[in-house]
């Protein structure tokens, strides 16, 4: 304890004197080691030092009040003038240093320090470190890492991956696939299909159909119809009409007219004649000269002059 206090009071300036005195004692080396450790901030080891230093003054005589050479005045009475040579050869006893006035230890020392503590412990070590921590742990590990993380996880995995992703998903799936695509889509669908195609289109439609066809066309139309037909034709026309008929014919003509009638006949001539020279009604065998006057005779179909009786019959 005395050596400890001396070391604390005088610091490194008294190291030489203190160490010289410690060399006379077998315990000096051990005590020096602990004093040296205490000098660099390990004052909590004071109680340990006190225990180790108790034996240092047991062989001393007196209380060492004079502080000269560690021997009391009564030792002088034991020596006489004839013992000066012996005095020089005598091994000096350990010098007991002065105690502090109050005899109290360092008030800042830790009274709970472990006397068996490791003297080589790092003074800057984390006091809150887990004593059960893995000594082989990675010192560069992420302190914010998930303690419940999968230890078998892929270290090269994408850190931005979706944590809610399907763990059974195809690892060879297309990473550029549309995330909004229809999950029920046909996997055998044509990859070159028109993405703008009508989703309501007839799946049984003719794949060779005209893409420019009229979307408003009659679905019941004749598939064998003439593709060159007049698109402005009368849809109500007679399908049995003569295809060789005169396209310039009078649409208001009498459908019951004589097809053998004179096409050059006067259309303004009255059929109901009132004298000679007029055509007789209901006589298809008669041919009348429309330009003849009343005195002209009516000719028959053979261009013969009729008899008077024949004329009178029709008059």
UniProtKB/Swiss-Prot annotation:
Residues 69-89 have a biased composition (Basic and acidic residues). Residues 269-285 have a biased composition (Polar residues). Residues 104-268, 291-303 have a biased composition (Low complexity). Sequence repeats lie at residues 107-110, 111-114, 115-118, 119-122, 123-126, 127-130, 131-134, 135-138, 139-142, 143-146, 147-150, 151-154, 155-158, 159-162, 163-166, 167-170, 171-174, 175-178, 179-182, 183-186, 187-190, 191-194, 195-198, 199-202, 203-206, 207-210, 211-214, 215-218, 219-222, 223-226, 227-230, 231-234, 235-238, 239-242, 243-246, 247-250, 251-254, 255-258, 259-262, 263-266. During host cell invasion, proteolytically cleaved at the cell membrane in the region I by a papain-like cysteine protease of parasite origin. Cleavage is triggered by the sporozoite contact with highly sulfated heparan sulfate proteoglycans (HSPGs) present on the host hepatocyte cell surface. Cleavage exposes the TSP type-1 (TSR) domain and is required for productive invasion of host hepatocytes but not for adhesion to the host cell membrane. Cleavage is dispensable for sporozoite development in the oocyst, motility and for traversal of host and vector cells. O-glycosylated; maybe by POFUT2. Residues 88-95 are annotated as: Required for the binding to heparan sulfate proteoglycans (HSPGs) on the surface of host hepatocytes. It is a lipid-anchor; GPI-anchor. Residues 107-266 are annotated as: 40 X 4 AA tandem repeats of P-N-[AV]-[ND]. It is found in: Cell membrane; Cytoplasm. InterPro entries: Plasmodium_CSP_Invasion (IPR051860). Keywords: Cell membrane, Cytoplasm, Glycoprotein, GPI-anchor, Lipoprotein, Malaria, Membrane, Repeat, Sporozoite. Its main location: membrane. Belongs to the plasmodium circumsporozoite protein family. The N-terminus is involved in the initial binding to heparan sulfate proteoglycans (HSPGs) on the surface of host hepatocytes. The N-terminus masks the TSP type-1 (TSR) domain which maintains the sporozoites in a migratory state, enabling them to complete their journey to the salivary gland in the mosquito vector and then to the host liver. The unmasking of the TSP type-1 (TSR) domain when the sporozoite interacts with the host hepatocyte also protects sporozoites from host antibodies. The TSP type-1 (TSR) domain is required for sporozoite development and invasion. CSP has two conformational states, an adhesive conformation in which the TSP type-1 (TSR) domain is exposed and a nonadhesive conformation in which the TSR is masked by the N-terminus. TSR-exposed conformation occurs during sporozoite development in the oocyst in the mosquito vector and during host hepatocyte invasion. TSR-masked conformation occurs during sporozoite migration through the hemolymph to salivary glands in the mosquito vector and in the host dermis. Essential sporozoite protein. In the mosquito vector, required for sporozoite development in the oocyst, migration through the vector hemolymph and entry into the vector salivary glands. In the vertebrate host, required for sporozoite migration through the host dermis and infection of host hepatocytes. Binds to highly sulfated heparan sulfate proteoglycans (HSPGs) on the surface of host hepatocytes. This is Circumsporozoite protein.
């Amino acid at each position: 304890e005395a050596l400890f206090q001396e070391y604390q009071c005088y610091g490194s300036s008294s190291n030489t004197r203190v160490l010289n005195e410690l060399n006379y004692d077998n315990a000096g080396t051990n005590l020096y080691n602990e004093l040296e450790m205490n000098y660099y901030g390990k004052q909590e080891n004071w109680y340990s030092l006190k225990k180790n230093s108790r034996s240092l003054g047991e062989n001393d005589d007196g209380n060492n009040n004079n502080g000269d050479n560690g021997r009391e005045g009564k030792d002088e009475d034991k020596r006489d003038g004839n013992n000066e040579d012996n005095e020089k050869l005598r091994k000096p006893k350990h010098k007991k240093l002065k105690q502090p006035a109050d005899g109290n230890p360092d008030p800042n020392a830790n009274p709970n320090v472990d006397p068996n503590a490791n003297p080589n412990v790092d003074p800057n070590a984390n006091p809150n470190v887990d004593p059960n921590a893995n000594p082989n742990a990675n010192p560069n590990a992420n302190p914010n890492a998930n303690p419940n993380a999968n230890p078998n996880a892929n270290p090269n995995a994408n850190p931005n991956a979706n944590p809610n992703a399907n763990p059974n998903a195809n690892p060879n799936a297309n990473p550029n696939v549309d995330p909004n695509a229809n999950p029920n889509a046909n996997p055998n669908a044509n990859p070159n299909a028109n993405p703008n195609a009508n989703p309501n289109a007839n799946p049984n439609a003719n794949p060779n159909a005209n893409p420019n066809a009229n979307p408003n066309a009659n679905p019941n139309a004749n598939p064998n119809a003439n593709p060159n037909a007049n698109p402005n034709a009368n849809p109500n026309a007679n399908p049995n009409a003569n295809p060789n008929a005169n396209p310039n014919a009078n649409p208001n003509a009498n459908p019951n007219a004589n097809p053998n009638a004179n096409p050059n006949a006067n259309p303004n001539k009255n059929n109901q004649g009132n004298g000679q020279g007029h055509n007789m009604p209901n006589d298809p065998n008669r041919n009348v000269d429309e330009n003849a006057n009343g005195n002209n005779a009516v000719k028959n179909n053979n261009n013969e002059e009729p008899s008077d009786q024949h004329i009178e019959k029709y008059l």
